[in-house]
Amino acid sequence: MKIIFDITIMVFLIPVFLFFFPIIYLLIIISDGYPAIYVQERVGKNGKIFKLFKFRIMDESSDEDLHEEHYKKLADKETIEPSLEPGNPIRIENDDRITKIGLFLRKTSLDELPNVINVLKGEMSTVGPRPLVVYESKLLGDYQKKRHSVKPGITGLAQVQGRLDLSLQERLYWDIEYVENYNIVLDFKILFQTIISVTVSYTHLTLPTKA
């Protein structure tokens, strides 16, 4: 059923990809030079490592270690637990590594458009927990296996709940909620909510709270 869902969505998403991809690619090259595509190793289903494709939104000379240091500081311990308790957001405030066009691409989520390539390669789904880099995945401890039991997605439940404004603990909570509550109807709701949050306004999906 998940494969049928992805194929159906790809029928509509590929024309969007073909239209916007060359435009954004050229804008990045003109504005910030090569490369326009950022390739990074991420953790996929069952812990398999794959190469994720995104549009580059940061200066080519930016310090990648800063991101890892930020995550470890947020975790404040070797592993994290899922929780809805408010915490420090994942987002790095006033991140001067992000380019001008990168700010627009991140705000509209168009930086994730090359993820379509990963979906076509069978490494990702259209909806699912976002693929993590290896050092992020290690922070999940015993929750790694459950979170990585499904394919990562272009968008997911955590993304429509707050994306980078969530804490690491909140994101893990919603990722686990998705895995435990997965169904096609939920996928359609998340997809619709993603479109709404990008193009109209930012609202929230709600799931029944566990007792």
Map each language-model feature to its residues.
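A hydrophobic, helix-centered structural microdomain
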Residues: 1-67, 184, 189-205
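Short low-complexity stretches enriched in small and charged residues
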Residues: 7-13, 72, 79-82, 112-115, ...
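Short pre-functional
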Residues: 14, 104-106
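A generic structural signal for residues located within well-ordered alpha-helices
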Residues: 18, 93-96, 111, 186
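Hydrophobic structural segments characteristic of membrane proteins
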Residues: 35, 89, 106-107, 113-205
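Short, glycine-rich, amphipathic interfacial segments at transmembrane boundaries or analogous
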Residues: 38-96, 155-174
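A short, hydrophobic C-terminal helix/tail in secreted or cell-surface proteins
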Residues: 206-211
